[in-house]
Amino acid sequence: MYLEQMNPYSISKQHKRDKLHVVERIRLLFDRDSFTEYYPEDEKNNDYAYDGVITGYGTIYGQQVYFYGQDFTHMGGTFGYRHSMQIIAIIKEAMKQKCPVIGIYDGGGARIQEGAASVAGCGELFYTNTLASGVIPQIAIIAGTCAGGAVYSPGLTDFIFTIDKISNMFVTGAKVINEVQGTDYL
């Protein structure tokens, strides 16, 4: 389980940015010792390869809640195909159990080095967000950067919470916009 293998250096990197690591966020959010990591069915019998997202379920004040949280310290929290599939699996499980799902977003969008597979995974996630709409409460917490294609997923949830001076949501960054427009406004 990834929670038990947390690297202290990764945590200190987040603290330097005035942010918590996803493991710390889980420990603060859930009732003590109630969180259980969840792996998609096809991962249970294989060596699980960590892909920058932790999924699971537990209780918050005794209420069952499902969860996914991005790890910015792993590849900038970017969405790879497996990363997206893991989030989709936890949302579908939350729908089966008729429980709310909380997602903590902290990443740089699609994992470009994976090419079209990463973007396809994001598209499948957006579709799953729409399937869950009106079925279960979907709550998004923007706990850092939420960039590029990844910004659409929280936009499809029921509630979005941001953190003053830490949260950023954008499709295209200021540097790219200024370059394309030939301006220096942003």
Predicted stretch roles:
Residues 1-65, 69-76:
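Intrinsically disordered, low-complexity segments enriched in small/flexible residues
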